[in-house]
């Protein structure tokens, strides 16, 4: 499971001219599911993201988590995080999970966050063409991988 985590001052997701998710201060998370991911990856990834100390404290040090600031989160499924561009010019997505498997893990990831944490979690629509509007705050962008490849 991979995530691109962006600290945002605001973000929104639009599908067919309808805003389906919108937040102020918080995190926008692009989440990719691989063919080897399992349910056990969900808790590691969700707990890591929510507890990352990437928000500034009173001394302007990144020392506060999403929970500390009671920020919001948007999660957007993005299979392209497993695009392999090492050969040729067209990415290969053979490491991405099948849509059926990815949907189950994506939904379970969202449920885990919503059940465990007292934060506003919103989401994009799985397999939809979305327009994601982001005001990256910092900018702060982090890459996470449940297999700890980076």
UniProtKB/Swiss-Prot annotation:
Q: Where in the cell is it found?
A: Cytoplasm
Question: Main subcellular localization, coarse class?
Answer: cytoplasm
Catalytic activity from the UniProt record = glycyl-tRNA(Ala) + H2O = tRNA(Ala) + glycine + H(+); a D-aminoacyl-tRNA + H2O = a tRNA + a D-alpha-amino acid + H(+)
Q: Name one Pfam family in it.
A: Tyr_Deacylase
Judging by the UniProt lineage, the source's domain of life is: Bacteria
The record, for InterPro entries, names:
Daa-tRNA_deacyls_DTD, DTD-like_sf
Cite the EC number: 3.1.1.96
GO cellular component, alphabetical, reads: cytoplasm
Q: Name one GO biological process term.
A: D-amino acid catabolic process
Q: Which UniProt keywords apply?
A: Cytoplasm, Hydrolase, RNA-binding, tRNA-binding
State the SUPFAM superfamilies in the record.
DTD-like (SSF69500)
Q: Where is this motif: Gly-cisPro motif, important for rejection of L-amino acids?
A: 138-139
Its job: An aminoacyl-tRNA editing enzyme that deacylates mischarged D-aminoacyl-tRNAs. Also deacylates mischarged glycyl-tRNA(Ala), protecting cells against glycine mischarging by AlaRS. Acts via tRNA-based rather than protein-based catalysis; rejects L-amino acids rather than detecting D-amino acids in the active site. By recycling D-aminoacyl-tRNA to D-amino acids and free tRNA molecules, this enzyme counteracts the toxicity associated with the formation of D-aminoacyl-tRNA entities in vivo and helps enforce protein L-homochirality.
Show the PANTHER family listed in the entry.
D-AMINOACYL-TRNA DEACYLASE 1 (PTHR10472:SF5), D-TYROSYL-TRNA TYR DEACYLASE (PTHR10472)
Tell me the subunit arrangement. Homodimer.
The free-text domain note is:
A Gly-cisPro motif from one monomer fits into the active site of the other monomer to allow specific chiral rejection of L-amino acids.
Which family would the database say this protein is a member of? Belongs to the DTD family.
This chain belongs to the protein called D-aminoacyl-tRNA deacylase
Q: Which organism is it from?
A: Petrotoga mobilis (strain DSM 10674 / SJ95)
């Amino acid at each position: 499971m991979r995530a691109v985590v962006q600290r945002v001052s605001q973000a929104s997701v639009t599908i067919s001219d309808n805003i389906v998710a919108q937040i102020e201060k918080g995190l926008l998370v692009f989440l990719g599911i691989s063919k080897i991911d399992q349910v056990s990856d969900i808790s590691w990834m969700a707990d890591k993201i929510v507890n990352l100390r990437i928000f500034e404290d009173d001394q302007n040090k990144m020392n506060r988590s999403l929970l500390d600031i009671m920020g919001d989160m948007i999660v957007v499924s993005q299979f392209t995080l497993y695009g392999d561009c090492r050969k040729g010019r067209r990415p290969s997505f053979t490491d991405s999970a099948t849509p059926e498997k990815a949907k189950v893990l994506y939904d379970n990831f969202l449920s885990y966050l919503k059940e465990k944490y007292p934060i506003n979690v919103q989401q994009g629509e799985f397999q939809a063409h979305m327009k994601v509007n982001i005001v990256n705050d910092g900018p702060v962008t982090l890459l996470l991988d449940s297999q700890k490849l980076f």
